[in-house]
Amino acid sequence: MKILDALLFPVIFIMFFIHLSIAQTDPELTIMTRLGQVQGTRLPVPDRSHVIAFLGIPFAEPPLGKMRFKPPEPKKPWNDVFDARDYPSACYQYVDTSYPGFSGTEMWNPNRMMSEDCLYLNVWVPATPRPHNLTVMVWIYGGGFYSGSSSLDVYDGRYLAHSEKVVVVSMNYRVSAFGFLALNGSAEAPGNVGLLDQRLALQWVQDNIHFFGGNPKQVTIFGESAGAASVGMHLLSPDSRPKFTRAILQSGVPNGPWRTVSFDEARRRAIKLGRLVGCPDGNDTDLIDCLRSKQPQDLIDQEWLVLPFSGLFRFSFVPVIDGVVFPDTPEAMLNSGNFKDTQILLGVNQNEGSYFLIYGAPGFSKDNESLITREDFLQGVKMSVPHANEIGLEAVILQYTDWMDEDNPIKNREAMDDIVGDHNVVCPLQHFAKMYAQYSILQGQTGTASQGNLGWGNSGSASNSGNSQVSVYLYMFDHRASNLVWPEWMGVIHGYEIEFVFGLPLEKRLNYTLEEEKLSRRMMKYWANFARTGNPNINVDGSIDSRRRWPVFTSTEQKHVGLNTDSLKVHKGLKSQFCALWNRFLPRLLNVTENIDDAERQWKAEFHRWSSYMMHWKNQFDHYSKQERCTNL
């Protein structure tokens, strides 16, 4: 037996070596990029076919040591074949332990070990003969700028790449303090380096995606939540605009209450973090040196304590208005038309607020029906709009209360869902869509540039050309997945359209229904059609299904579609009445009442309460008046 083993060993070794050599020389699996060779792997898809995946390709030097908090540096070339057959480490981030073992939260936690050496990207290529000039779709994950990873199962690009014959790319970027800690004037911690990670990955796509059969002139960036806000920020940032073609924004935009902070607030949070981890007060250089000396988990453990108030849908380290990445605030840039002139597709889910309510709103839990008392509702409103004064809070309460049934615990629960979702997602996104669409009309009418007050030359802003390329497509996703593990009252939750965009219902073992598989195929087609042509209705062969046409959103008609298992339906006005409160009335109200002295503010608040009481009294009196009276006394 030993002699036989001795004879067989060289044969086995040679066969293994031949197999390895074939794998390394297979033109499908080994690609030469500008930086060096990468070796990928074949991944199966449900129809007995496969895609080619290149997982964990480095696009930046590891941001370790002195590079912590600094902008990324492009990856240097390598000599050997880089093994790109498995996902990279996740960037350091907060891990949600609120519901241990519960798949609804665990699916968003990193599924790879965490490391600061995390700036890698993934590429999925359809297994077509010699792919060439394919449309490219680059995914940017969400997670409140404090979490997220490109390796999550829900972001698996194989199904979208295979079904729509597009090249799918996703990247890791730094989050939390590692990506967004900012000290004004400091080159060591300028802020926004997480966005610069994304931009460097987009530059890698421009430089290398043609080696994988992709077209660098046909790149659509898409993302969800903070990932969608990031997409919108690249639409605004002048240096990002040339690096992609179109944009899809799912449940997030760059304007709104949680996406950015001022440099003063960013500095306050950086200093507070230093104190929390034991850094002595001193100058910026000393602070950064001390923060760099700390273990990554030390910073993660303290990050939530830097917030100036307790609120829902608020995050510690987010992009900062720096005058470089952002020449001005997102609101100001939108209002002046200073954004990329291109087509956008964007939308929201039906219940954008429910997910965030279980993380601190009084009375809410995933483990019960969350029937909310009036007292819990009023406390929840304060947490939902932490920047508002008493008058502003009364305005929100007045708008969202059913005064004929104000103590109804189900209606209070639904109102809280609407308040959080409308304030943070729906209404900022509606405003973003309207501003984009409005500038398309203005440029068509004037046919002239207004770049004198913008100064961006040929940077691709919507207001520098009379021939605007802008068109807007808006959706409301309102299908609750049949296998969703969250309670029924949470509805169509923030983030749960992603699995349909990435084609997970095509995987039989995941137990979606046939109707959900069809919905997923439709959504992938809409997304890919838009990426190819700027119009979700135009199929890859140029045909259009006239029976189910998705109309352009305009600032006047405001048409949008409902995405669900039914046939496509067109609606008008995305929560227009409620968004008038958030986008127009409340900002003006807070501005007018900002300088009112305490006595007058208290009087006005009491007056609003009295008005509400009188309205309630009148309703009760009217009800009493309509009752039959006893006539026998």
UniProtKB/Swiss-Prot annotation:
Its membrane topology: Peripheral membrane protein
Top-rank lineage group of the source organism: Eukaryota
InterPro entries: AB_hydrolase_fold (IPR029058), AChE-related_enzymes (IPR050654), AChE_tetra (IPR014788), CarbesteraseB (IPR002018), Carboxylesterase_B_AS (IPR019826), Carboxylesterase_B_CS (IPR019819), Cholinesterase (IPR000997)
MF (Gene Ontology): acetylcholinesterase activity
Known catalytic reactions: acetylcholine + H2O = choline + acetate + H(+)
Cleavable signal peptide: 1-23
Glycosylation positions in this chain: N133, N184, N283, N368, N511, N591
GO cellular component annotations of the record: extracellular space; plasma membrane; synapse
Keywords noted in UniProt: Cell membrane, Disulfide bond, Glycoprotein, Hydrolase, Membrane, Neurotransmitter degradation, Secreted, Serine esterase, Signal, Synapse
Annotated Gene3D superfamilies: alpha/beta hydrolase
Localisation per UniProt entry: Synapse; Secreted; Cell membrane
Any Pfam family matching the protein: AChE_tetra
GO process terms (BP): acetylcholine catabolic process; choline metabolic process
PROSITE patterns in UniProt: CARBOXYLESTERASE_B_1 (PS00122), CARBOXYLESTERASE_B_2 (PS00941)
Active site (catalytic residues): S225 (acyl-ester intermediate), E352 (charge relay system), H494 (charge relay system)
Enzyme Commission no: 3.1.1.7
Primary location recorded for the protein, binned into one broad class: other
Paired cysteines (S-S): C91-C118, C279-C290, C427-C579
Xref: SUPFAM superfamilies: alpha/beta-Hydrolases
PANTHER family named in the record: ACETYLCHOLINESTERASE
Function, in words: Terminates signal transduction at the neuromuscular junction by rapid hydrolysis of the acetylcholine released into the synaptic cleft.
Family: Belongs to the type-B carboxylesterase/lipase family.
Name of the protein this chain belongs to: Acetylcholinesterase
Organism expressing this protein natively: Electrophorus electricus
Lineage: Eukaryota, Metazoa, Chordata, Craniata, Vertebrata
